[in-house]
Amino acid sequence: MNHTHKTNWRSLSFAAIICCCSTIAACHREVTREPASLPNISVIDDHGRPVSLSSLKGKVVLLDFIHIGCPGVCATLVSKFGEVADSLKPELGSRVVLLSVTNDPEHDRPEQLLALARSSDADLDGWLFVTGKPDDVDRVIKAFGVNNERMPDGSPAHITQVFLLGTDGQKKREYRGMLMKPQAVVSQIRDAMTQVQGGAS
């Protein structure tokens, strides 16, 4: 009887070890998965021109998602982006790009985005307001783990996350947009630029 119990315990212990090893391997796969990054697609800017997102590599990018007809949350995000842009004037466009992507591409046309940009006094040399094919825009949104959800009336839900991307196009930081402190973001953008200057990967 005792011999049988010992055999059973050994079997259970071996099974537990196998289970633990499998769990550790699964956790390792989760940790090493590919980081969020801009997909290699083209979008349309506020002048109706195609822009390849891959062309932004080599620059630090601050990314958000907005849409026309969103006076509350989106207006706040635009205002905060404006503060960031004003603090980065020397580097804006050459080393840093602000990228505002509409999450309502079915309705937001380039001319509407241009009107929004102008009414916000946006520096269009380094701040892109873009739309595109719905499938392409969805790819950008989902690349950062966000769902482009709809409200009961069919209008797009607010996306409040803001993303800081390194020069390789990969996500370095994520912010809650409504709580984002522009000057803190500016400091982190400058840190990202300094890392590039210093040859850091």
Pin down the residues of each PLM region.
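Sec-dependent bacterial lipoprotein signal peptides
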Residues: 1-25
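Short, small/polar residue-rich loop motifs at catalytic or cofactor-binding pockets
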Residues: 37, 60, 157-159
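Hydrophobic beta-strand anchors of alpha/beta hydrolase catalytic cores
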Residues: 62-63, 98, 162
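Structural microenvironment flanking redox-active thiols in thiol-disulfide oxidoreductases
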Residues: 78-140
